[in-house]
């Protein structure tokens, strides 16, 4: 039986793990819903998610006075035109149609909130949208939009520069795992932390430029989204390397470094190895290959039988072999379409990569990081004897000061008002200054 066209893919947790689901066949629209000429009552940008169990799917809907668009960032769907929008008092219906197949949203408008039911192919899930204020919609990123050339196409980024004329050093900031944007926010998690945006702005204030970018398939780089089975870890490395090459050609920059956060640390190591990078900084980077990281995480979640099966699958993947038959309970992690990416990812060992770097290296971690424990940083530092190690008290995985309890720690992941953890920026600046990676008029020099 031929599988219907796939529209929605869900990325889970930290492993760019996607699960496909099929389009809903055309449904009859309630005849009582009357189409109106103006949708001014709901005009504007609305953000929220489809509440799929354990895997909320972020969506963005923009209504105009006559129609609208929908974006599903995880899928790479950007401002796709709505087929119809119908409003009757507080009852709202809108849909999209692709290849003559339909997805529907039906709900109620309650001032600044829309809630209702999303339906496709006989499956229904709740959805909720919140209206963005005019101030939020109008808010623009500071900095200069830039593009780097790839083997196929271009990748977009944001250049943040100091106020002085330069030349100044520039740091390529690489985001962590999953569907993460240039500011450090994961679209699969409601709310923002803006940690990488804060880092870029703080560096600019101290005379250090930076380039940060949405990962391929996310935000400004949705155009780079491809089929899941075609994704390879090397593509992320090539993206980072392209930014190094871009910066090397720009006369505004005196030196070029890389700052990699979480998975971005591994990507950054590999990119630094293949380019003429002057310095490398790891923020909350793992100290072991992803298969070992996965086993530790799965040990806390799976039954003994499922854990054994997971280990067997990982053994095969490490040998470059795909596993076609996967238990339904493990499908979201090990489905066949994601296995080529995992095979390519497992190939990279941060312990081996960090030893091969011939440039100054700073390894940073927080002692309240519940995703990547400080012993990872210590392991990297041990292998790279001439590296510098910085363990920051009370700092967690999103680079914020966090309480000791898990719930309070996780709450910082969605609070953009919290500043970066004290000691992070100064620690980075001291390291850069020590290795002469500073602006001409840097006050620390």
Which residues make up each language-model segment?
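Short beta-strand/loop motif that positions the catalytic acidic residue
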Residues: 357, 363-365
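N-terminal cap/lid segment of alpha/beta-hydrolase-fold proteins
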Residues: 51, 130-166
């Amino acid at each position: 039986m031929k599988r219907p066209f796939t529209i929605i893919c869900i990325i889970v947790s930290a492993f760019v793990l996607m699960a496909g689901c099929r389009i809903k066949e055309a449904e009859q629209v309630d005849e009582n819903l009357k189409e109106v000429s103006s949708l001014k009552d709901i005009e504007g940008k609305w953000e929220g998610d489809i509440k799929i169990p354990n895997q909320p799917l972020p969506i963005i809907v923009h209504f105009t006075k006559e129609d609208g668009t929908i974006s599903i960032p995880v899928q790479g769907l950007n401002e796709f035109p709505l087929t119809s929008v119908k409003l009757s008092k507080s009852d709202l219906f809108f849909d999209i149609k692709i290849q003559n197949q339909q997805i529907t949203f039906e709900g109620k408008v309650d001032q600044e909130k829309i809630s209702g039911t999303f339906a496709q192919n006989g499956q229904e899930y709740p959805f909720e949208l919140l209206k963005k204020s005019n101030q939020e919609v109008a808010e623009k990123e500071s900095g200069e939009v830039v593009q780097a050339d790839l083997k196929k196409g271009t990748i977009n980024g944001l250049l943040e520069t100091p106020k002085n004329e330069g030349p100044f050093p520039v740091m390529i900031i690489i985001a962590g795992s999953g569907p993460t944007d240039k500011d450090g926010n994961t679209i699969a998690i409601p709310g923002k932390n803006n940690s990488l945006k804060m880092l870029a702005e703080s560096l600019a204030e101290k005379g250090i430029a930076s380039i940060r970018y949405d990962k391929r398939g996310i935000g400004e780089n949705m155009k780079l989204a491809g089929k899941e089975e075609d994704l390879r870890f090397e593509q992320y490395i090539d993206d980072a390397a392209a930014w190094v090459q871009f910066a090397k050609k720009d006369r505004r920059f005196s030196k070029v470094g890389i700052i990699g956060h979480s998975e971005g640390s591994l990507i950054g190591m590999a990119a630094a190895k293949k380019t003429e990078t002057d310095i490398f900084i790891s923020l909350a980077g793992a100290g072991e290959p992803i298969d070992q990281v996965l086993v530790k995480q799965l040990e806390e979640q799976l039954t003994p039988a499922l854990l054994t099966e997971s280990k067997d699958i990982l053994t095969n993947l490490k040998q470059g072999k795909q596993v076609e038959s996967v238990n339904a309970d493990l499908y979201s992690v090990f489905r066949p379409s994601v296995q080529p990416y995992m095979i390519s990812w497992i190939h990279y060992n941060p312990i081996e990569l960090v030893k091969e770097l011939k440039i100054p290296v700073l390894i940073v971690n927080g002692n309240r990081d519940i995703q990547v424990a400080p012993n990872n940083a210590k392991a990297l530092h041990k292998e790279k004897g001439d590296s510098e190690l910085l363990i920051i008290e009370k700092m967690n995985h999103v680079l914020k000061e966090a309480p000791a309890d898990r719930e309070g720690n996780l709450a910082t992941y969605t609070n953009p008002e919290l500043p970066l953890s004290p000691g992070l920026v100064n620690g980075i600046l001291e390291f850069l200054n020590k290795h002469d990676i500073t602006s001409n008029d840097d006050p620390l020099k």
